[in-house]
Amino acid sequence: MLSQVASGFTEFDPPKGRPSTADGPLGWPGYDEMRARAQDRTGETESVVCGTGRIGGTDAVLLGFEFGYLGGSLGERTGDRIEAAHTRARELRLPVVTLVATGGSRMQEGMRALVQLQRVARQTALTAAAGLPQLAVVRDPTTGGGWATLAAGADVVLGLPGAQAAFAGSRVRPPEADPAAYTVEAQHAAGHIDRIVPEAELPTALSRWLTLLGGSADRPQRPEPVPVPYALPGPTACGRLPDSGPEAVARARAAGRPRAAAYLDAFLTGREELGGDRCSGTDAGVLCGFGVHEGRAVAYAAQCGTPTRPAGYRTVARLVRMAGRLRIPVLTLIDTPGAANGPEDERAGAGPAIAEVFTAVAEATVPITSLLIGEGGSGGALALAAPGRLWVTPDSYFSVIAPEASAAILKRDPDQVPRTAEELRLRPQDAVELDVARGVVETAHGAARTPGVPRPELRPDEE
């Protein structure tokens, strides 16, 4: 598969390993003969082939597993090669792409094989700390330690349709287990794989991701902030600021108001999305990924106007942390009535998930630019707002809680909701006056803005 995804592949010389003993570290009867037969069958001397190649317009270090060599299993010499490949990647400042197809640790080497997972994990951690992106392609099968380190631990995980992907291999699962639970499709639905890609489309998909994430060696330690997008015109009001709290709420909730996808399409090109939180699932109401604005990569996290679920918050936190390591500035688009608050959301860890986002934003090592494009409902919205770098659109509101909920907390009758909305001072211009937001952005056609507030532009020194 290496030749299918990369041009000009040049294999590394195998590292000088430890002295070989007959039949391996355990003296497993017939092990040398097994390796010899595997070499005759595949033409390879180990289960992984490593080298450099070019994917699209990006040079990368590639690791390709050969499942025909003892089931792609990881042994001591496999660990030697993976360690050497990651070391070269850090020396050359190149991203790492791993094409995984493995049954796990090599039985014939026992614990000496199992501890290779620790070596692999250390190497991937060092490469991540060096700010280099790691992509993994899950082929059939990807099980055991290979799934739990090289595949599931990558920044971006792509899966081939129908491939097995699981920690438990097919021969060690419970007999009553549903085979569908151990597939790429199941892992994607659970938020562990970002995208399922047909094999014919894999070179293009890898090229797009490397274009977005590669080049971290050339990025400044502290990149310039993302400029603030213009507001998109809504169905009514033509950019005029709302006169009252109830009007602000009504405009933010209007069915025809532009949503996050429209803003992203207008602001970014070449978008690629992350597909989950790497924990429990996905949230269709949150879009996270990377795109290009005026020639440079931008990470984005955008709420789509629905209550945000725990998986959505964890995906946002994942994105912010990844962007920090890769030195890519972040844009957040805020639009939610609040965090999802059903029993299933509490069981899924709504509080800890929101805390993850607050922490990720507070600790961010790259600048975050935030724009409120619709509803700003309580802490579920505030979690995505960068302190000191928040702007608001004319069709938005930001409130400590939705006015209906506020009235209920204050034990007011439902007919007091409009009064409550007024008293909360939740209009976009109120957010500016209360020093919550820096300004109200202009609409794309140049409508009015808050008097005295200049058109928002972030300068490099505004950090």
Feature locations, PLM:
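Glycine-rich anion/phosphate-binding loops
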Residues: T42-E46, G72-A84, G276-G285, T308-L319
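Active-site-proximal flexible loops/turns
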Residues: S73, Q108, R251-A252, G342
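Conserved catalytic cores of soluble enzyme domains
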Residues: T102-Q221, G338-E462
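A structural preference for short, pocket-lining loop segments at secondary-structure junctions
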Residues: G53-E66, R81-R106, F290-C304, R314-N341
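Glycine-/proline-rich flexible loop or hinge segments
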Residues: D32-M34, L63-G71
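Glycine-rich phosphate- or other oxyanion-binding loops that anchor nucleotides, phosphorylated ligands
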Residues: D59-V61, F67, G75, A113-R119, ...
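A structural preference for long, well-packed, hydrophobic secondary-structure segments
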Residues: A128-A129, Q303-V330, A348, T359-V366, ...
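Intrinsically disordered, low-complexity segments enriched in small/flexible residues
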Residues: M1-I55, P203-V298, A302-P307, R449-E463
